[in-house]
Amino acid sequence: TEVIAHLIEKYSKETDFLEACIKSGKELGGYFALSIINTDRPDEIIAMKKGEPPLLIGRDEKQNVVASDTRAIALYTDNVASMRNGDIALIRKDSIKIFNNGERVEREFKPIDKEEMTTDKGELLPNIMKKIVSGDKIA
């Protein structure tokens, strides 16, 4: 992962951050799903996907988020879109722009079926995982 950061830093000296991420992604071999934040622009996320690893974008009226799993994103948003191979997204609080092969593309956002992710007590599974990790007892 340090290699990726160094590549982005190298290209950032000659172009903007999004283009630096695009150029860096072209040099990376194998499959990846990345979420990149620039400390100079903490209100932006660059999401990049190559190959099979899952990468999702969630959106609602208040925020846009990125995660690799629907259950992780379900606590923060109600709608989700799957990124496709080669997608690069520029995500801000109030906007999402997705590109593939240099062209702007649209991805379909679908409602998350939170019912299938709940326990018999009606609690979202990510909440249960938080309790397990934090050491809370589950009766």
Q: What do the PLM-derived regions correspond to, one by one?
A:
Residues T1-A139:
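Conserved short alpha-helical segments that host acidic/polar catalytic motifs at enzyme active sites
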